[in-house]
UniProtKB/Swiss-Prot annotation:
The gene is ZNF442. InterPro entries: KRAB, KRAB_dom_sf, Znf_C2H2_sf, Znf_C2H2_type. Residues 29-115 form the KRAB domain. Keywords: DNA-binding, Metal-binding, Nucleus, Repeat, Transcription, Transcription regulation, Zinc, Zinc-finger. It comes from Homo sapiens (Human). One of its GO terms (cellular component) is nucleus. A zinc finger (C2H2-type) spans 181-203, 209-231, 237-259, 265-287, 293-315, 321-343, 349-371, 377-399, 405-427, 433-455, 461-482, 488-510, 516-538, 544-566, 572-594, 600-622. This is Zinc finger protein 442. Signal peptide: none annotated. It is found in: Nucleus. GO terms for molecular function: DNA-binding transcription factor activity, RNA polymerase II-specific; RNA polymerase II transcription regulatory region sequence-specific DNA binding; zinc ion binding.
Length: 627
């Protein structure tokens, strides 16, 4: 029985379907499979603190094995000395002794451990294997258990020599690719039964060390302690050169190499060097093309596990990084950090023309094109040039229709799965995002966030002119009113627009494309927003309510116009005489009194008038004459 904290946890280690015989097979190799071993090259790179941590982890491992009454195999003397597992024990004890204080010895017996003497070759072992002392019969020595000297195990492919057979086996696995232990639940394979057991524990959400704050479970106490620091904020490892602190020693070591320039891991293919092993492994996969991490939902594979975790959020909808200023949430940290720069404007890469800051050089380059007008991405099919690569990719899908995510209903293709899911809901009518204030539902989360600001009145994106906006895209579009920039031009008529959305809507006037049809009256519209607005005529829905007098409106523009009655605000001012108006069309009509422009002509008498309302009044004079 495996007991942690008074609770029987035997079920964590093996699936229920496995037989007692299979359990015995796992138990018989338990120590060697859970032992953490380093090659000689890796061990030389470890510092005193890391070696001390290694000792703590191994002690804890053996205490756990001691709890389940682990015994060591008793084979004949010849087999013992040929057995690579015995060499591994000797190897680890040697490493374990190195990590102890100078005044400690391997023969020291820790308190509370009862050694049990084996009948074979006078070997003495405590059940807590690394906490005990070991003696070997002088006539029977394992494979040169010493730090220097002969290295009898040489790998044929890479030429690396090893003191210990287990180190040789560890090196051999990447070449042979041999993985012997399969998880019956997910099919993943492992090179040792110990790794399989740990995988099963993690998969079942188990582990003896459970965080009281978030409930996450861990197999190793060292990992548990590291995790706890994410809650406490403790950073015990401080760089002596720049005072930057880290919660994990390995992160501290990686950082130190930024000062020393040390890069001990060199790629055999291209000689590129890396400061840490994980970066080296990730780089190697760019040569081999290996993508071991596969998404269970769509089959897409990734070279690193973190990329898989981020990708899986596109299926689950999980967005753990939320902006406290505007409420927008993100799948991964990088996007969140880039978003925050939009609020602060203090990115490290500054535009020399307008002073705006960006998080990376590529974002700055894209922005600079709005000043220079440069459009380096040209479509070979239609000749259209675009300033951003993402816009170019989206444009190419219009020609090819072969985006990775294709709608089965209308055939439209999309690059991003989240955008594709939002589009699918235009066909199904599904609206999973509901407002807690008024119960209104939306197809995409961004629409819900925009709607919620109508309740809170929050407008987090502020222009230098004082005007504020609900979302970043509206803010961007507004900025072009100051610069006068209209980078999106219609190829048909030459009309230019400040944003791509306006251009797309305009294009449909040439194409006569109206894909969105009203189910009630069959009237068709060029874009989805117009259809939704039109449907309110049939439903009588009036979602926009005045907070002053409770009058409701079908459209936001009507509400905004109405609110000016209460506020007396006149946003539209004539630049020639200073007269202000509540609506833009009133301003346009007024401006014609200065220019003398008369666009509206009476068909009866040919008289031209400056406004449509004036024309209607004039027409009545003809009607009176006929009466």
């Amino acid at each position: 029985m495996i007991v942690f904290g008074g609770e029987d946890r035997s079920d964590l280690f093996l699936p229920d379907s496995q037989t007692n015989e299979e359990r015995k097979q796992y138990d018989s190799v338990a120590f060697e499979d859970v032992a953490v071993n380093f090659t000689q090259e890796e061990w030389a790179l470890l510092g005193p603190s890391q070696k001390s941590l290694y000792r703590d982890v191994m002690w804890e491992t053996i205490r756990n094995l001691d709890c389940i009454g682990m015994k060591w195999e008793d084979t004949n003397i010849e087999d013992q000395h040929r057995n690579p597992r015995r060499s591994l024990r000797c190897h680890i004890i040697e490493r374990f002794s190195e990590s102890r204080q100078p005044d400690s010895t391997v023969n020291e017996k820790p308190p509370g451990v009862d050694p049990c003497k084996s009948s074979v070759c006078g070997e003495i072992m405590g059940c807590s294997f690394l906490n005990c002392y070991i003696t070997f019969d002088a006539g029977h020595k394992p494979d040169e258990c010493q730090e220097y000297g002969e290295k009898p195990h040489t790998h044929k492919q890479c030429g690396t020599a090893f003191n210990y057979h287990h180190s040789f086996q560890t090196q051999e696995r990447p070449h042979t690719g041999k993985k012997r232990y399969d998880c019956k639940e997910c099919g993943k394979t492992f090179s040792s039964s110990g790794n399989l057991r740990r995988h099963i524990i993690v998969q079942r959400g188990g582990g003896p060390y459970i965080c009281k704050l978030c409930g996450k479970a861990f197999f190793w106490p060292s990992l548990f302690r590291m995790h706890e620091r994410t809650h406490t904020g403790e950073k015990p490892y401080e760089c002596k050169q720049c005072c930057k602190a880290f919660p994990i020693y390995s992160s501290y070591l990686r950082h130190e190499r930024t000062h020393t320039g040390e890069k001990p891991y060199e790629c055999k293919h291209c000689s590129k060097a890396f400061p840490d092993y994980s970066s080296y492994v990730r780089h190697e996969r760019t040569h081999t093309g290996e993508k071991p991490y596969k998404c269970k939902r769509c089959g897409r594979a990734f070279s690193v596990s973190s990329s898989l975790r981020i990708h899986e959020r596109t299926h689950t909808g999980e967005k753990p990084y939320e902006c406290k200023q505007c409420g927008k949430a993100f799948h991964h940290l990088g996007s969140f950090q880039r978003h925050m720069i939009r609020h602060t404007g203090d990115g490290p890469h500054k535009c020399k023309i307008c002073g705006k800051g960006f998080d990376c050089p590529s974002s700055l380059q894209s922005h600079e094109r709005t000043h220079t007008g440069e459009k380096p991405y040209e479509c070979k099919q239609c000749g259209k040039a675009l300033s951003h690569h993402s816009s170019f990719r989206s444009h190419m899908i219009m020609h090819t229709g072969d985006g990775p995510h294709k709608c089965k209903v209308c055939g439209k293709a999309f690059i991003y799965p989240s955008v594709f899911q939002g589009h699918e809901r235009t066909h199904t009518g599904e609206k999973p995002y509901e407002c807690k204030e008024c119960g209104k539902a939306f197809r995409i989360s961004s629409s819900l966030r925009r709607h919620e600001t109508t309740h809170t009145g929050e407008k987090p994106y502020k222009c230098k002119c004082g005007k504020a906006f609900i979302d970043f895209y509206s803010f961007q579009n507004h900025e072009t009113t100051h610069t006068g920039e209209k980078p999106y031009e219609c190829k048909e008529c030459g009309k230019a627009f400040s944003c791509f959305t306006y251009l797309s809507q305009h294009r449909r006037t040439h194409m006569a494309e109206k894909p969105y049809e009203c189910k009630t009256c069959k009237k068709a519209f060029s874009h989805f927003g117009n259809l939704k607005v039109h449907e309110r005529i049939h439903t009588g829905e009036k979602p926009y309510e005045c907070k002053e007098c409770r009058k409701a409106f079908s459209w936001l523009t009507c509400l905004l116009r109405h609110e000016r009655i209460h506020t007396g605000k006149k946003s539209y001012e004539c630049q020639q005489c200073g007269k202000a108006f509540t609506r833009s069309r009133f301003l346009r009509g007024h401006e014609k009194t200065h220019t003398g422009e008369k666009m509206h002509e009476c068909k009866e008498c040919g008289k031209a008038l400056s406004s449509l309302s004036s024309l209607h009044r004039h027409k009545r004079t003809h009607w009176r004459d006929t009466l």
